[in-house]
Amino acid sequence: MTILFISDLHLSPLRPDITDCFIDFMQNEAIHAEKLYVLGDLFEFWIGDDDNSPFNVSIKNEFKALTEKGVKCYFIQGNRDFLLNKRFCKETGVELLDDHTVIELDGEKVLIMHGDTLCIDDIKYQEFRAKVHKPWLQWVFNRIPLFIRQRIVKNVQDKIKEKKQTKTLCIMDVTQSEVERVMQEEGVQRLIHGHTHRPDTHTFMSNNKEMTRIVLGDWYSQGSILEYSDKIYSLHKKEFK
């Protein structure tokens, strides 16, 4: 049994190198897996399931081809693609999961998430997240003409880049106390997440129990894949061609 986890690809027409690496991964690696979990930020920005640009359609086709061949695909929304929803899933065969989802791997309960909710020291981001996740606001946004949404998102992207330059690295990382709280709340000793772009495996003690936190990498300069097989977790790099 092989299960794969990826996140933070930030797919965009402006980065064909990332897209090519992703397509190669889907067609030559994911095809041999039992399941594929995408833990958010698949896209640089997703402005709605009605955006059928040639680029978006090409990515959807990769997922559709994979699910039609029997590979189960699951998706957790990230901070860049939280508007990806039911229509995308219907068109691709992907199953949308809750922000915090507990899965079972060979009898062990494992919590999976995007990871942005763990960065509670970044107060301004958490306030922004709470606003944009309001159902009524998303309902209104999805009914704005597509070309206007594209302009809005472009402005938001520019502001995000400006703010990131002024934030310290520790603020953009997870808060350890929140990690422990969430893991205890969900009753797990293993957590897998993305968002921070810092691939690593962390072990620590909490309430006299050994906990493990696995962080997925981003795809900015190379692909990053977590493979689970024979009860072993392995983080792999995938070089761009």
Swiss-Prot record:
Q: Does the keyword Iron-sulfur apply?
A: no
Q: Does the keyword Membrane apply?
A: yes
Keywords, A to Z, come to: Cell inner membrane, Cell membrane, Hydrolase, Lipid A biosynthesis, Lipid biosynthesis, Lipid metabolism, Manganese, Membrane, Metal-binding
Q: Which Gene3D superfamilies match?
A: 3.60.21.10
Topology within the bilayer:
Peripheral membrane protein
Which top-rank group of organisms is this from? Bacteria
- Location in or out of the cell: Cell inner membrane
User: Which reaction is the catalytic activity of this chain?
Assistant: UDP-2-N,3-O-bis[(3R)-3-hydroxytetradecanoyl]-alpha-D-glucosamine + H2O = 2-N,3-O-bis[(3R)-3-hydroxytetradecanoyl]-alpha-D-glucosaminyl 1-phosphate + UMP + 2 H(+)
List GO BP terms, alphabetically: lipid A biosynthetic process
Q: What is its EC number?
A: 3.6.1.54
The positions annotated for binding Mn(2+) 2 are D41, N79, H114, H195
Q: Name one GO cellular component term.
A: cytoplasm
* Molecular function, one GO term: UDP-2,3-diacylglucosamine hydrolase activity
Pathway(s) this gene product operates in, as recorded in its UniProt entry:
Glycolipid biosynthesis; lipid IV(A) biosynthesis; lipid IV(A) from (3R)-3-hydroxytetradecanoyl-[acyl-carrier-protein] and UDP-N-acetyl-alpha-D-glucosamine: step 4/6
Name what cofactor the protein needs. Mn(2+)
This protein's major location comes to membrane
Q: Which residues bind substrate?
A: N79, R80, D122, K164, K167, H195
Q: Which InterPro entries match?
A: Calcineurin-like_PHP_ApaH (IPR004843), LpxH-like (IPR043461), Metallo-depent_PP-like (IPR029052), UDP-diacylglucosamine_Hdrlase (IPR010138)
Binding site residues for Mn(2+) 1: D8, H10, D41, H197
**Which SUPFAM superfamilies has this protein been placed in?**
Metallo-dependent phosphatases
Cofactor binding note from Swiss-Prot or TrEMBL: Binds 2 Mn(2+) ions per subunit in a binuclear metal center.
Instruction: Sum up the protein's function in the record's words.
Output: Hydrolyzes the pyrophosphate bond of UDP-2,3-diacylglucosamine to yield 2,3-diacylglucosamine 1-phosphate (lipid X) and UMP by catalyzing the attack of water at the alpha-P atom. Involved in the biosynthesis of lipid A, a phosphorylated glycolipid that anchors the lipopolysaccharide to the outer membrane of the cell.
Report the sequence similarity comment from the record: Belongs to the LpxH family.
Q: What is this protein called?
A: UDP-2,3-diacylglucosamine hydrolase
Organism the protein comes from: Aliivibrio fischeri (strain ATCC 700601 / ES114)
User: Per UniProt, what is the name of the gene that codes for the protein in this document?
Assistant: lpxH
